Amino acid sequence: CALPICQGLLGRAYVDLAQRDRTGDGWLEDTARQIEVLGFDLMVDREPATLRPTARIDAPVLYFGWYSGAADGPFLLPGFRFAPGAVALHIHSFSAATLRAPAEGWAAALVARGATATVGNVYEPYLQFTHHPNLLLRALVRGATLVEAAYEALPALSWQAILLGDPLYRPFAVSLDEQLTRRDELPPTLAP
């Protein structure tokens, strides 16, 4: 298979727009277009609120969204887990203000629920200086490591932005055939 999806993750993708700002929504629309080209089963939510708790969200391996201060919706349901290798980010000014309390912010909540990689902000960087999700995904698909992709997605280096995950992680480095041979090893709740 020649598609980048054949070189990486196995699961569903979710993009949650906020109808809040043309710039941020534009990044997420571009992210959704990239995911579509990759061939993922994709759900795009264009409602102003974040995903509803009743939204279908199973085997999530890619999640890009914004804009609420703390994790909510399906991410708080008992038993919710990201699929192995998941890359997840939620744009918010203080998404990584604390990593010790998953109920406060997004970064800690995403990691606590199994995300392998995320980026966030410890303090207000303003939208233009946060990680651009479309650039992050584009770099990862190209084969960049997580740290390279996070660097490319950040318009200016700042103490406000952080990366959580193995800096050498390359989510699109494992072939689809290899993933499918290991599929039976996944717990039923994570098997796509």
Predicted regions and their residues:
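Short, small-residue-biased leader/transition segments that mark boundaries at the very start
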Residues: 1-3
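Extended, regular secondary-structure scaffolds
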Residues: 9-11, 21-22
